[in-house]
């Protein structure tokens, strides 16, 4: 249901993770395309360290346990890379992979095979809308494969996206079943190697409640209030530790467990970098560059100079 303007939103802040969502975040990162993409937590750590001048010793204690879980799942998941790439690679300009759309369908219609023809069509169209990132009800007119093909052509989809949508239209049940098996395997490995994160999840839930309150627009800017759901569930997120993600199709917000810590670290070293620059203004360019290089390579990197 959609929240009416001015009415309060029912927001539930959970203190536990969603293992299936964690594995989708994990595998999406592995297959995220692009030359600048970070495909594992270690690469994310290097990116954060380089971009914000955060010393490695600040990030390693936070991220190493998560990196070990990620590596354990990726190393032991007995599914071909081709099939993983099919489900977990974002395509075209879509922000998310096919896995999210199918996962929502799995939760909503666990017995897809027993649905009536009209119910199956509605589920397929909802899944495709989510996958294509098009407005709600954009596919309500689609009742046959010809309608779908016409829509895809008008929508300017890539050939890869057209093929996936057509395949889903014909064999949705097979893809739901295959993804369900993959997620069961992945979550089993994930939970098997997961350390105790009880306190971390509680802290994240408390911080999320403080930041969001009863209005997600406090942390998600430029939201269309008219399209907000009446109820939202907020989950702590380990594999999406450094960000916030709102799954509109499922009314879930995934709140990164280190969002607060990383924000504080970025601020801390941003302030120290500004202080360092001001102290070096009177030094010649050559000497200044040599000092900066020494600090960057040394143990005092990130510390203030008195």
Question: Model-derived features: where do they sit?
Answer:
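Functionally constrained cores in energy, signaling, and assembly domains
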Residues: 30, 279, 302
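Short, leucine-enriched amphipathic alpha-helices that occur as contiguous helical runs
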Residues: 276, 285-288
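Short capping segments at the starts of secondary-structure elements
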Residues: 298-304
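C-terminal regulatory or interaction extensions
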Residues: 194-278
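N-terminal, charged low-complexity regulatory/assembly segments
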Residues: 2-227
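Short helix-to-turn junction characteristic of helix-turn-helix DNA-binding domains
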Residues: 280-284, 292-298
């Amino acid at each position: 249901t959609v929240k009416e303007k001015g009415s309060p939103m029912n927001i539930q802040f959970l203190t536990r993770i969603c293992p299936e969502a964690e594995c989708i975040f994990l595998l999406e990162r592995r297959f995220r395309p692009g030359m600048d993409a970070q495909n594992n937590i270690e690469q994310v750590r290097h990116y954060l360290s380089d971009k914000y001048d955060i010393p490695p010793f600040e990030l390693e204690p936070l991220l190493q346990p998560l990196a070990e879980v990620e590596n354990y799942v990726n190393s032991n998941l007995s599914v071909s890379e081709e099939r993983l790439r099919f489900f977990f690679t974002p395509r075209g300009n879509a922000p998310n992979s096919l896995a999210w759309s199918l996962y929502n369908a799995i939760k909503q219609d666990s017995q897809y095979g027993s649905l009536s023809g009209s119910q199956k069509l509605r589920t397929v169209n909802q899944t495709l809308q989510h996958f294509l990132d098009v407005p709600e009800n954009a596919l309500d007119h689609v009742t046959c494969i010809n309608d779908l093909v016409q829509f895809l052509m008008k929508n300017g989809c890539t050939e890869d996206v057209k093929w996936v949508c057509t395949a889903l239209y014909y064999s949705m049940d097979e893809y739901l079943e295959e993804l369900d098996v993959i997620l069961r395997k992945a979550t089993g490995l994930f939970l098997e190697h997961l350390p105790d994160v009880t306190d971390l999840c509680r802290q994240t839930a408390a911080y999320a409640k403080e930041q969001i309150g009863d209005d997600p627009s406090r942390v998600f800017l430029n939201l269309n209030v008219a399209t907000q759901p009446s109820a939202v569930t907020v989950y702590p997120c380990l594999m999406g530790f450094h960000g916030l993600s709102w799954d509109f199709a499922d009314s879930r917000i995934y709140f990164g467990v280190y969002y607060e810590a990383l924000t504080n670290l970025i601020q801390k070293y941003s302030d120290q970098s500004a202080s360092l620059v001001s102290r070096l203004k009177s030094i010649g360019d050559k000497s200044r560059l040599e000092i900066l290089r020494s600090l960057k390579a040394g143990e005092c990197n990130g510390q203030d100079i008195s």
